[in-house]
Amino acid sequence: MGDLPGIVRLSIALRIQPNDGPVFFKVDGQRFGQNRTIKLLTGSSYKVEVKIKPTTLQVENISIGGVLVPLELKCKEPDGERVVYTGIYDTEGVAPTKSGERQPIQITMPFTDIGTFETVWQVKFYNYHKRDHCQWGSPFSVIEYECKPNETRSLMWVNKESFL
């Protein structure tokens, strides 16, 4: 086991396929558990891009709402700052969220030797007939996290989450 990094910075980007289209969120205020809702379309594929700093960290998959997404190491960024992993998240078979409701979905990403990143996204899944609703709100490129691994190497504490 190597040294435990003081801070881990990671970003998670979602792009709807096949055209790498943007994913949107809306601000719901305090009506639900979280103030931001990510809008996703059922029966669709999303490219997941995870960027991690420091570059010595390794990850094999991310679980999004219980769907295991294998991640493939793509590259280091040209400046050598972060390592980039990609995978495909498929919403085939996911039930649309009922009107007026939101779904909390668990996100987990186990890292080799330093513990598991965990967070919860508030999501609304729309079916094909309401697909235009997925484009109402604000597009985001990435969700960035600043995390601190705990001493037992079991979990990482999320210090900061930013939608950019």
UniProtKB/Swiss-Prot annotation:
GO terms for biological process: regulation of trans-synaptic signaling by endocannabinoid, modulating synaptic transmission. InterPro entries: CNRIP1. It comes from the Eukaryota. GO terms for cellular component: cytoplasm; GABA-ergic synapse; glutamatergic synapse; plasma membrane; presynapse. GO terms for molecular function: type 1 cannabinoid receptor binding. Suppresses cannabinoid receptor CNR1-mediated tonic inhibition of voltage-gated calcium channels. Interacts with the cannabinoid receptor CNR1 (via C-terminus). Does not interact with cannabinoid receptor CNR2. Belongs to the CNRIP family. This is CB1 cannabinoid receptor-interacting protein 1. It comes from Rattus norvegicus (Rat).
